[in-house]
Every structure is written in structure tokens, then in C-alpha cells.
Amino acid sequence: SVPEIERATIVSGILIGLQNKSFRKSYQIDKAPSQLVEDLLKAIERVLESNGMGGKTKILLGEYGKISQSNKLAISEYIRDNETGKDEKNTLLRDIIHELDVKVFPFTEYKHIGYDILGQFYSEFIRYVYGDKKLGLVLTPQHITELFVDIARPNVDSVVYDNCCGTAGFLIKAMKRLIELAGNDEAKKKHIREKQLIGVEERSDMFTYACSNMMMRGDGKSNIFQGDSLSERVKDKIKAFKPTVGLLNPPYSTSVSELEFIYHNLDCLDSGVCVAIIPMSCVLAQSGINYQWKKKLLEKHTLDAVFSMPDDLFYPTGTVTAIVVFRVKTKHPDNYETYFGYWKDDGFIKTKNVGRIDYHGRWEEIKQYWTYNYHNRREIKQHSVKRHVTENDEWCAEAYMETDYSLVTPSVFETTVQDYVLFRLRNGIE
């Protein structure tokens, strides 16, 4: 088998290479694995260049070039058959290409929806590969990327920025919304793809997947940059685009506070709103580095809303999260009431071997209920509340909602206390 960490690169490269008609016709010709890899890399290079990837081509080819280092795919001329125990001719790479060519790539022939289907397959495959928490990534669930766009409510002229763009999930959802708003204006759609979607990603593998992910949706000139989004050099480049909507899921449990990534995203926005999902420990902090960043954020921006998300949203990881919404470049007013939502039930349930799914089809109705109440700032018992807060307060609905004691039984009380203790231990809260 091929290691998980290599699978995403291989599948990504093949799906790009198959867009080259010459390669798609010739890959089935009997040839050595090393020659097939060489042909694949040449096909990838041609497709990247034809899509206007420019200087990014070299970076992407550096990542895809790792395929040629795989002993099983590119070097060994013979491979051991696990069933017979005999060495047979190595056709593993050709077989993988054929499977993708037959079962996945044909969707691109459907002009209006094909590349989106291909892109969705690709996104889900990346999610499958990087879903292993041992790889150090927490990818945003698809329905949450969609929710972000509904919270931010971009207009057709919005410029969207994600400074931790990963595989470009937020940018893809934003692109889809902006293009829908553009209607039949093809010139505007072109402008959206080329000028209104901005991303930064530091990891070379994630940067590669983000670029290819956008390209598979017809966006070959996306402004996704590789680099440190906290550096002034990169920020100056981003500010030139005058972004108006920030969307991000910063990396968790690194040496940099998640709130710092939000601060730098806001610093790059010309106006508008920033929506981010972060560990609950960040919004609860009343001391330490997260507390300091809470204070800095309120000195320059307005905390518009905080939503407490389902505890198992990032299952199988144990990260409990909250979505925060900031209005840009206006100091948090002394008398401003922040909206707090208790969004703990998104309708998804955990299923064996599949993870969390919208098994009962409740998500769309729940999402509309959440966003309608937020945009109209409705206070609803056991669901939402408005409060004036400072950096000294806990930024979560649970701290301000009235408790319905009729629902509290001894067993519920015991379970809640146990969950609370575990939560504080997991998040390092004293």
C-alpha cells in the first residue's frame, strides 16, 4: 500500500495530469514505471502552465516531483503480489491512473457541474488522508465552510482572504457564492476568480493542494501565496488587494496563539468582517497569552458575535470550538452588546467508519435558523443572548444564558460536571 501522506499528492497530480489530452491517451501504453512518472510530471507541468500558474508552477512541481521518489510507484520494475507471493510486473501507478480516469475524471465532461464534482471528490479525498490527527491537521468540515459564508454575507464585490487557507475550503465556498451573485455576468465571474479570492498557506503540501483544488474548479489564476501570513512582507502583498471578508480556521496547538492569526487577518482587511473558528479555550482565557490577544483585538476591532459549536464537531479529535465574528477597524464600543449563540446541535450524528453525517437531513433547516437569528440579533431562551463584554469576560453563550433547572436531573448534573472537568483538563485551564 501507499502511505497516507503520499496518497493526496499522487491523486492530486494524476487528476491534473489527466487534463492533458496527450497524456490521457498515452498512459496505458506499456512502459517502465520511471518513464510513466516522467510522462505524468511533464503532463502536470503543461497543465499548470496552460492554466497560468506562473511562478507557482515550480513550487507545485517540487511537491509533485516527490512521486518519482516512491519505490512502489516509480522505481521498482517488479512488485510482490501479496496473494501469490510472486514478483509481478509493476503496474501499480498505471492502475491507479486508470481507476481515476474511468471512475472520477469523466465528471469533467459535464461542463456546468463536472469540475465541481471533481473538486468535491478531491476535497473529500484530502480530508480522508489528512483526517488522521497524527498528521497534525484539523480540517474544517464542509458544512461549516458553507456556514461561514452565510455568516459573513459577502456581496458580489467582496474580496475574500484566508491567511491559513489549507486546502482552500473557505475560498472555494466563497467563490461559489460570489459567482452565484454574479449571475450571467461572465466578465465579473472572471474578475472574481482572478482578483477577489486571496489565500496564504505556509506548508508546501497544503499550498499545492489549495492551488490544484482551486484550479479544478476553473480558477487557474487564484491568488494563493506560499509563505508566513504573519510576516509584514506577506501582509503588505495582501493589503494591496484590499480584502473585505476574512475567513479562517487557524492551526491549533502551535507556538502561535490562534487569536494572533485572527489579529493579522483583521490587520489585512480594508473593511468588513472576519469569521474564524478557534478552540473554546481562546475565548474563555482570563490570563496568559490568549487573554493578551483578546485585549489587543478589542482595542482595534469590534467583537460582533461568538457561537459555541458542537463538542464533537472535529471528531475524532477532541477539540471543542467556538466561531468568532469581528467587525473590522472599529474599537469595541464600551456599550456594545455582543451576540452569543449556543449552536451545539447541528443535526449531525457520529456513525461507524464514516464520522459525523447529516443522517436525518436536518442541517439546512438548522443553519437557516441559526443565521436568521444572528443577523436579526434575536435573543431566544436556551439559544442566544446579548451581553456587553470585555477581555476580562468569558466569550461564550454558556456564561450568560439562564439555566432551565427543570431539565437538570442528578444524572445530568453529574455528567455535566464530569464533562466540564474533562474540558478544562483538555484545554489546559486551571
What feature does the model see in each segment?
Residues 226, 238-240, 244-430:
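A conserved structural/catalytic subdomain of Rossmann-like adenosyl-cofactor enzymes
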Residues 135-255, 260, 267, 279-281:
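Conserved S-adenosyl-L-methionine
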Residues 1, 18, 103-108, 128-132, ...:
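Alpha-helix C-capping/helix-to-loop hinge sites
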Residues 1-26:
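Non-catalytic accessory regions of SAM-dependent methyltransferases
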